[in-house]
């Protein structure tokens, strides 16, 4: 009888343990142990490498985490986050469940959902990081990514919001610029060849398609749910109609598209385009400061709202340096790192921190940032249009390639 009771007790304990939320290993609740394990580790940070200012910022982060924590951070520069996701998928298929080649990944949206659904992410760690106490948890996008709960499997890094900009020396004042996608279509017809967008699946190009879709469909709330193939064609018909109408008056008559945002930015600098856009409110000022765009460039948004979200870092389940990756993720949430990141002299990426959670000195430092001549104030940025469920972007990119891809 005693043996039977012991067995039942053991079974109950196992069931109880299974019912508890998964805890990351190492456990960020024991932060001194995480830092001790991280010292001496090398973290391979897979992140987009298409911006010199972002690359410089990541180099600064690497210097800081090496100096403070003994962690070596190597930036693996990507053109497309899906490349890193594919690596982890291949490693899991090959049974490489430890010592993976990707330790930390800059991610959000459909790539995050894909990794979460396939069990490719480390257990929830983000909300246990010491610097989580500074995060603006009143912003739902720091815990929900494209309508999908993050479950602590990715740590917020920065904010993003679509902003348009133009060279006012050629286009005239931004007050005369289009104020929604219908007006943009009319403007493009009046200025043939002076507008374009990066070809999906480039992130900025795909984001533009979402902006158009949200504005053009009758019921944007449909986009909060996963794609239903039964009504995909009907729901997205207004998007394809808009794209068909604008294509003949795009740059190169829509026969070619900029490869990515840097290529589109260069076309503005070369006076081949008059209006472009980015997913960072400070991008225009940063480009002016870097000498990449003339100082006559100014930003504008659509009064009805533009697309916005949060971007994150996540740790693959088979990372060879999970402790080191946690230390880097935690440093990225520090007031020091977030302050430098928001400064357009370095990057200009909006913070994910709550000003109320910071010390008076840190709040003053954020308030003192010179945001540059082309950066709109928070009050001028207008409403945020929430991201659709990630499954919509996957299907829209596929359909765009069929219709307009080379």
Positions of PLM-derived features:
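Bacterial N-terminal signal peptides that target proteins for export
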Residues: 1-9
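Periplasmic-binding protein-like
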Residues: 160, 242-246, 257, 281, ...
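Mature extracytoplasmic/periplasmic domains
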Residues: 306-307, 311-380
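Extracytoplasmic ligand-binding site segments that recognize negatively charged/polar headgroups
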Residues: 48-60, 76-83, 98, 102-262
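Short, polar/charged alpha-helical segment
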Residues: 30-39, 46, 51-72, 164
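Bacterial N-terminal signal peptides
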Residues: 9-18
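A ligand-binding cleft/hinge motif common to bilobed small-molecule-binding domains
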Residues: 112-114, 276-294
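Conserved C-terminal helix/tail region of periplasmic/extracytoplasmic solute-binding proteins
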Residues: 26-30, 266, 373-406
């Amino acid at each position: 009888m005693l043996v039977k009771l012991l067995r039942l007790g053991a079974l109950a304990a196992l069931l109880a343990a299974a019912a508890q939320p998964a805890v990351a290993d190492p456990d960020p609740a024991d932060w001194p142990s995480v830092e001790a394990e991280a010292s001496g580790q090398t973290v391979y940070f897979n992140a987009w490498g298409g911006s010199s200012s972002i690359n410089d910022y990541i180099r600064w982060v690497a210097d800081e985490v090496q100096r403070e924590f003994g962690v070596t951070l190597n930036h693996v520069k990507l053109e497309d986050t899906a490349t890193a996701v594919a690596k982890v998928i291949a490693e899991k298929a090959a049974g490489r469940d430890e010592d993976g080649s990707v330790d930390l990944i800059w991610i959000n949206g459909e790539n995050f959902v894909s990794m979460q659904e396939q069990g490719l992410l480390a257990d929830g760690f983000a909300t246990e990081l010491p610097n989580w106490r500074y995060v603006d948890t009143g912003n739902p996008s720091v815990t929900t990514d494209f309508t999908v709960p993050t479950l602590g499997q990715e740590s917020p890094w920065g904010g993003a919001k679509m902003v348009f900009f133009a060279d006012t020396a050629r286009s005239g004042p931004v007050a005369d610029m289009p104020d929604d996608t219908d007006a943009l279509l009319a403007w493009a017809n009046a200025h043939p060849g002076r507008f374009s967008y990066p070809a999906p699946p480039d992130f900025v190009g795909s984001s533009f398609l979402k902006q158009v879709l949200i504005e053009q469909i009758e019921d944007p709330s449909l986009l909060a749910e996963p794609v239903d193939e039964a009504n995909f064609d009907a729901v997205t018909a207004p998007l394809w109609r808009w794209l068909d109408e604008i294509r003949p008056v795009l740059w190169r008559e829509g026969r070619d598209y900029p490869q990515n945002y840097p290529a589109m930015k260069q076309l503005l600098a070369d006076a081949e385009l008059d209006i472009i856009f980015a997913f960072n409110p400070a991008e225009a000022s940063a480009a002016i400061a870097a000498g990449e765009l003339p100082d006559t460039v100014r930003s504008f948004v659509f009064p009805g709202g533009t697309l916005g979200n949060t971007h994150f870092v996540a740790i693959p389940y088979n990372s060879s340096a999970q402790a080191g990756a946690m230390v880097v993720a935690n440093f990225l949430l520090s007031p020091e790192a977030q302050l430098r990141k928001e400064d357009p002299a370095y990057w200009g990426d909006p913070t994910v921190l709550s000003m109320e959670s910071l010390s008076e000195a840190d709040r003053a430092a954020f308030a003192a940032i010179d945001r540059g001549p082309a950066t709109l104030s928070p009050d001028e940025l207008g409403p945020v249009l929430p991201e659709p469920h990630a499954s919509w972007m996957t299907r829209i990119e596929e359909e765009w390639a069929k219709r307009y891809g080379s």
